[in-house]
Amino acid sequence: MPYDAEILVVGCGNILFKDDGFGPEVIKALEEYFKDREKPDNVMFIDAGTGGPHFVFSLPHEEWKKMIVVDVVEFNAEPGTLRKFDVTEIPKGSYENMHTWPVSQPLHELSEKIDVVVIGCKPKEISAPNVEMGLTPPVKKAIPRAIQMILDEIGVSK
């Protein structure tokens, strides 16, 4: 499937490791939200799983104008707290995939070409390497607000 929309909403994370699955769960909730509503034609939702940094971020398309990355981010806040980050303010060392490859590098390069924002949720628990599926309660409760933040970013009123 070509990722050829103007606005991409990319959920990153691994559903096998508790709160690390926040991004994919938000994408699933967005798809559910738009089942009975008209989604803007210029917007695409992508569950990138753990492949976001390796594939989606490094394969820019000429159509792209904006990318909204949804993921867990370590920052000083209570679990379940959401924050919109500019790529330049992602705390160093706090936003890495399971192989400790810094995600900020391809995002910084991509942000030179298009508008990139990160909707970050403070995780309570990432269970890796132990497989434990399901979000913790505070992170699960953050999904509706994350959806509202994304709707605001793509210019859709609830």
From Swiss-Prot:
It comes from the Archaea. Belongs to the peptidase A31 family. Keywords: Aspartyl protease, Hydrolase, Protease. The keyword Transport does not apply. Pfam families: HycI (PF01750). Disulfide bonds: none annotated. InterPro entries: Pept_A31_F420-red_hyd_d (IPR004411), Pept_HybD-like_dom_sf (IPR023430), Peptidase_A31 (IPR000671). GO terms for biological process: protein modification process; protein processing. One of its GO terms (molecular function) is enzyme activator activity. SUPFAM superfamilies: HybD-like (SSF53163). The keyword Nucleus does not apply. This is Coenzyme F420 hydrogenase subunit delta. Does not copurify with the active FRH.
